[in-house]
């Protein structure tokens, strides 16, 4: 099939036509289907046509059934009523006509305090009835009418019947009203607005479900396919105005089940309490519920409708059985589902398939028949189910607690990765490898093999009981090889991966001789993980719409984000998010020892880029979600005052603040300056970025970190924090100044160390201990003193010195000369003695 081209990837090229096989087998079960060849020969698959019998129809003399006659009478009774009469003529069934009358009664009442819910199966005319009711509201003078649905494509029928209603009311296009088409490529030129000018300026405007803030001036709000919109979003759309909502109770548009059991039940209770005089949020409102049972597309009881619903699993919501019990998650086991057996059209396999699709639809996934074919034929997709303890003594299907659909990705050649980077084009499939390749310009990651969890759906009666977590945990352990296979041969895998040569088999037998029937000898539907050898993977990834609850779920299982889309979805208003979890594998060198494995550097780069985008792209993101994504470290060990700053932290004040910023921060923490001194004049954003990069070891509480994120990274004011966190302004500023004091304490310590390191220091004298004993030291000093004394005495008794005192003149002067020389000798002796004494005193000082 041509559609198989979309299912093929570089590493998975063989698609199997299970969907077509099941389709042909289902035709044989439909008694109203006739299969013929190009020569109009009835094929053996439609042999039941031989026993066809006419079906009796109750008709009156005019050829009308009883229901058609009642509709004709209703139209004749209201022919003169405006605007009801002209609009009723456009109705095809009696149920549809009564629904339009109910809508118009509440419109003409103009009390704007009614909520009307329209529930029906597919093909009953819900959207057409809403379109005719909107045309009646315009005729009644309503000016502001808003319409919402999961997508504008869901409103094609509604807007078509608005225009048909205008034609019935004699409105002319381009004269009395204009139709505006969407310029968004994703909306495929769907109608998004109708401007009416006949009476006065009137507008019918499409809004997206999450844009409830635009409903300030609305008079009538119409919600089509409300079951496909998350319940909290639908509740946010309700208000003090007229509300019409419709829901399909089967099919892919939504469950209808969640809506009818929760929202409609709540609206009925509020209507009853208001009637009893109890005040509430929506007190005083009237609620009505309309159900359409008569089909427009098919006759009553047409087997084609039931056959189509069974083939495409459109009655999936009716296939959700009640659980027989809720076992503990630790006692549950994960099983691999063999798709050959699942789509074999056997009775038990069909029941199991219907139950699996019921979980998909009840989990508010956007479903279509294409998804069913993807499950059946895509070569890279695999299915797992979480089951409770199986009682083999009972011959019945076990309860399905959780379903996981996995798509194998990766194993892309490096040449393809380089080609994608050079051309900017990405082939279909392999979402996570190509997105990783684009974000980090990395050509190694696409060559790794991984698995992307496409869908995970839990039974509606078992939500938030731990079954989804158990399924993810078992799936991770399975791909890490913790479930050792019982045998090395994988017979089940060989059966599924063997392609069926359909064309070759068709040439062996003609159509008139071919007998189509379910296969025999198929493998078991459910295979325990120990009985199947897992594919060798390096990571598991997920792509989902970013919400706080979903992100915390995946983060709890150690998945880390690497991509968040900058533009929110036009349908849900959510940003797309991709997360990864590395698996324990010996093929990859892990340089880090943390939980992120080889993804550590990429995760840190993502956090850095995300913190920069918080002031722009993600400025309005909920602070709790931003905190969960950044996941800052808020508790640090207090370093000792004598130790140096730890590695990885800020070591220079210039990296964070200027000297003047530090002075202003000091003034604020000393209560000498106002809060705006910090908010405006200090480079506060840079400081908070260092905190969230774990470069500032400042311990903060969760409230303080959240306030700093809003002010420093998202550039929000205190009023915004008051609304988001529900705190008083004084409480916010109190927490803020506490955090600033902690910042100031650390930064002031850094500044003090910088100043201390810049001051000149005196050189230190190194004193080494002596290596000789005290006795040896004393003996050495004594010998030195004795030598000094001898040298001093030798200098005194020097002959040359004494020669100057010798006799050499007249005798008359002899006595005088002798006296002078005697005195000089005495003086020399005294000086020598003094020097000896001083040496001894010095020696004594050294010894002591």
Predicted regions and their residues:
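Conserved coupling/interface region of RecA-like P-loop/ASCE motor cores
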Residues: 4-66, 83-87, 91, 264-322
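N-terminal pre-P-loop "Q-motif" helix
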Residues: 66-75, 84-114, 129, 701-703
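Acidic, serine/threonine- and proline-rich low-complexity intrinsically disordered segments
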Residues: 115, 444-450, 454-467, 472-848
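Conserved RecA-like ASCE P-loop NTPase motor core of nucleic-acid helicases/translocases
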Residues: 117-119, 141-155
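Hydrophobic positions on the alpha1 helix immediately C-terminal to the Walker A/P-loop
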Residues: 129, 133, 471
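Inter-Walker segment of RecA-like/P-loop motor cores
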Residues: 150, 157-215
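Signature of the SF2 helicase/ATPase Hel1-core->accessory helical subdomain module
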Residues: 227-281
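A conserved beta-strand-loop-helix scaffold within acyl/acetyltransferase catalytic domains
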Residues: 343-461, 478-530, 546-548, 565-568
């Amino acid at each position: 099939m041509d559609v198989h081209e979309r299912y093929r990837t570089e590493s998975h090229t063989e698609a199997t036509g299970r969907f077509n096989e099941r389709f042909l087998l289902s035709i044989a079960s439909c008694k109203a289907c006739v299969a013929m060849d190009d020569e109009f020969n009835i094929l053996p698959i439609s042999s039941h046509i031989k026993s066809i019998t006419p079906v009796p129809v109750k008709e009156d003399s005019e050829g009308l059934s009883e229901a058609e006659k009642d509709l004709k009478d209703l139209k004749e009774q209201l022919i003169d009523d405006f605007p009801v009469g002209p609009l009723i003529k456009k109705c095809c069934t009696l149920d549809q006509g009564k629904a339009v009358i109910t809508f118009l009664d509440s419109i003409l009442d103009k009390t704007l305090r009614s909520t009307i819910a329209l529930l029906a199966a597919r093909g009953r005319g819900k959207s057409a009835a809403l379109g005719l009711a909107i045309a009646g509201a315009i005729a009644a003078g309503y000016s502001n009418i808003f319409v919402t649905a999961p997508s504008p494509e869901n409103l094609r029928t509604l807007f078509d019947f608005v225009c048909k209603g205008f034609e019935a009311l004699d409105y002319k296009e381009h004269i009395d009203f204009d139709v505006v088409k969407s310029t968004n490529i994703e909306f495929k030129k769907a109608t998004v607005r109708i401007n009416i000018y006949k009476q006065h300026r009137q507008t019918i405007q499409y809004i997206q479900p999450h844009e409830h803030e635009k409903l300030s001036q609305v008079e009538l709000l119409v919600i089509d396919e409300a079951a496909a919109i998350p319940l909290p979003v639908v509740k946010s759309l309700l208000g003090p105005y007229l509300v019409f909502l419709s829901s399909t109770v089967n099919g892919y548009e939504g469950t209808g089940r969640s809506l009818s059991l929760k929202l409609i039940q709540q609206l009925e209770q509020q209507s009853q309490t208001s009637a009893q005089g109890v005040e509430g949020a929506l007190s005083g409102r009237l609620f009505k519920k309309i159900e359409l049972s008569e089909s427009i597309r098919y006759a009553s009881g047409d087997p084609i409708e039931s056959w189509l619903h069974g083939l495409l699993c459109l009655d999936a919501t009716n296939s959700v059985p009640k659980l027989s019990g809720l076992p503990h998650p630790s006692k549950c086991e994960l099983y691999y589902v063999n798709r050959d057996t699942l789509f074999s059209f056997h009775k038990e396999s069909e029941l199991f398939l219907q139950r699996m699709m019921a979980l998909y639809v009840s989990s508010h996934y956007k479903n279509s028949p294409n998804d069913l074919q993807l499950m059946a034929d895509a070569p890279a997709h695999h299915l797992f189910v979480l089951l409770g303890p199986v009682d083999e003594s009972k011959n019945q299907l076990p309860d399905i607690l959780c379903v996981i659909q996995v798509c194998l990705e990766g194993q892309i050649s490096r040449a393809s990765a380089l080609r994608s980077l050079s051309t900017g084009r990405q082939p279909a499939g392999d979402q996570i490898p190509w997105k990783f390749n684009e974000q980090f310009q990395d050509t190694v990651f696409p060559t790794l093999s991984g698995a992307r969890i496409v869908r995970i759906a839990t039974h509606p009666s078992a939500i938030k009981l731990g079954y989804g977590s158990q399924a993810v945990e078992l799936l991770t352990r399975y791909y890490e090889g913790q479930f050792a296979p019982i045998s090395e041969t994988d017979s089940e895998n060989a059966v599924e991966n063997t392609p069926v040569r359909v064309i070759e088999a068709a040439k062996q037998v003609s159509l008139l001789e071919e007998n189509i029937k379910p296969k025999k000898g198929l493998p078991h539907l459910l295979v325990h993980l120990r009985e199947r050898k897992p594919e060798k993977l390096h990571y598991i990834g997920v792509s989902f719409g970013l919400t706080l609850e979903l992100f915390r779920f995946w983060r709890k299982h150690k998945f880390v984000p690497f991509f968040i889309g900058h533009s929110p979805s036009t349908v849900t208003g959510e940003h797309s998010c991709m997360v990864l979890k590395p698996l324990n594998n010996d093929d990859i060198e892990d340089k880090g020892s943390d939980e992120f494995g080889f993804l550590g550097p990429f995760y840190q780069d993502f956090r850095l880029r995300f913190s920069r985008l918080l002031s722009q792209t993600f400025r309005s993101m909920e602070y709790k979600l931003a905190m969960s994504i950044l996941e800052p470290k808020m508790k640090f060990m207090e370093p000792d005052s004598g130790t140096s700053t730890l590695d990885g932290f800020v070591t220079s004040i210039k990296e964070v603040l200027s000297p003047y910023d530090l002075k202003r921060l000091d003034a604020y923490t000393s209560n000498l300056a106002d809060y705006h001194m910090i908010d405006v004049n200090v480079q506060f954003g840079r400081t908070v970025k260092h905190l969230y990069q774990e470069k500032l070891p400042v311990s903060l509480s969760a409230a303080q970190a959240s306030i700093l994120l809003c002010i420093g990274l998202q550039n929000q004011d205190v009023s915004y924090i008051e609304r988001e966190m529900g705190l008083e302004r004084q409480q916010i500023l109190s927490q803020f100044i506490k955090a600033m004091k902690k910042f100031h304490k650390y930064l002031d310590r850094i500044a003090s160390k910088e100043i201390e390191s810049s001051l000149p220091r005196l050189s230190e004298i190194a004193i080494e201990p002596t290596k000789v004993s005290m006795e040896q030291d004393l003996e050495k000093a004594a010998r030195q003193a004795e030598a000094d004394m001898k040298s001093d005495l030798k200098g005194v008794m020097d002959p040359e010195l004494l020669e100057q005192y010798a006799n050499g003149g007249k005798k008359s002067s002899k006595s005088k000369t002798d006296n002078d020389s005697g005195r000089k000798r005495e003086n020399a002796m005294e000086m020598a003695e003094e020097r000896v004494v001083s040496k001894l005193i010095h020696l004594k000082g050294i010894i002591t």
